[in-house]
C-alpha cells in the first residue's frame, strides 16, 4: 500500500496533474513532505523508506523555492534529509550533512520560535553532540524542557531528557521522563517510540 502511494505521487508529478501541482502552495507541499517523512519512518523496508525520504526531500525543496519563509517547509527538509542520513544507522561522520541539518533547524526556529518539533530536534542535537561539534548540554536541556511545555505529548524530548538525567546522575528523574515518554507513545499508538522509551527505561535499570 505504501509503495502504491509513492507510485501515485510520482505519476501525478509527471502526467496530467502538472497544472495543479504548479499552483500548489508551499504549505501543501510541506505537509506532503512531512507525510512522506512519517511514512518512511513507519516502513520496515529499506528501499521503500529511501523512496519516501527522497520524495519528501524533493517536495520540501519545492516548498522552500515557493516560500523561503515557511517554517514547515524548512522543517520538512530537515526531517527527510535527517532520516535519509540514518537509513543505515546513525553516524556523525557526515559533517557537511550534519551542518546542513542544523541550518534547516535554525531557520525553522528563526521563522517559528515555538516550533516544538524543531526545538526538540535541536535540543537533542545539543545534548548528544560533542562540544567540538557545537554540543551544549545545558542549552539543549533547557530547549527540551521548553518543548514539553509547548507539547505535553512530546515523546522524543522526554527520551532525550531521560538521557540527560542519566548522564548527570539523576536516575530517578530520568526514569520519570522515560515512563512519561512511554505512556505518551502508547497514547499516540507509536510502536517505534514505545520501543525507544522501553529501551531507555532498560538502560536506566527500570521496569516498564
Where in this protein do the model-derived segments appear?
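Structural signature of tandem alpha-helical TPR/SEL1-like repeats
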Residues: 51-55, 91-104, 132-146, 169-178
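TPR alpha-solenoid repeat register
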Residues: 73, 118, 157, 190-191
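N-terminal leader/linker segments that initiate helical-solenoid repeat arrays
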Residues: 17-59
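Conserved structural position within tetratricopeptide repeats
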Residues: 58, 64-65, 106-110, 145-149, ...
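Terminal, low-structured helical/coil segments at or just beyond the last alpha-helical repeat
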Residues: 164-167, 171-208
Amino acid at each position: 500500500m505504501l509503495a502504491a502511494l509513492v507510485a501515485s505521487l510520482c505519476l501525478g508529478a509527471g502526467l496530467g496533474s502538472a497544472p495543479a501541482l504548479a499552483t500548489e502552495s508551499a504549505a501543501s507541499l510541506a505537509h506532503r513532505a512531512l507525510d512522506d517523512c512519517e511514512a518512511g519512518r513507519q516502513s520496515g523496508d529499506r528501499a521503500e523508506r529511501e523512496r519516501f525520504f527522497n520524495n519528501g526531500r524533493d517536495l520540501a525543496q519545492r516548498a522552500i523555492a515557493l516560500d523561503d519563509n515557511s517554517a514547515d517547509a524548512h522543517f520538512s527538509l530537515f526531517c527527510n534529509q535527517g532520516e535519509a542520513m540514518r537509513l543505515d544507522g546513525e553516524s556523525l561522520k557526515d559533517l557537511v550533512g550534519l551542518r546542513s541539518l542544523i541550518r534547516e533547524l535554525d531557520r525553522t526556529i528563526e521563522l517559528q520560535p515555538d516550533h516544538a518539533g524543531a526545538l526538540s530536534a535541536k535540543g537533542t542535537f545539543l545534548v548528544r553532540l560533542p562540544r567540538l561539534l557545537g554540543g551544549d548540554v545545558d542549552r539543549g536541556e533547557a530547549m527540551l524542557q521548553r518543548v514539553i511545555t509547548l507539547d505535553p505529548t512530546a515523546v522524543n524530548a522526554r527520551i532525550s531528557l531521560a538521557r540527560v538525567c542519566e548522564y548527570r546522575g539523576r536516575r530517578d528523574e530520568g526514569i520519570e521522563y522515560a515512563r512519561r515518554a512511554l505512556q505518551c507513545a502508547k497514547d499516540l499508538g507509536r510502536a517505534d517510540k514505545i520501543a525507544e522509551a522501553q529501551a531507555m527505561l532498560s538502560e536506566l535499570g527500570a521496569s516498564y
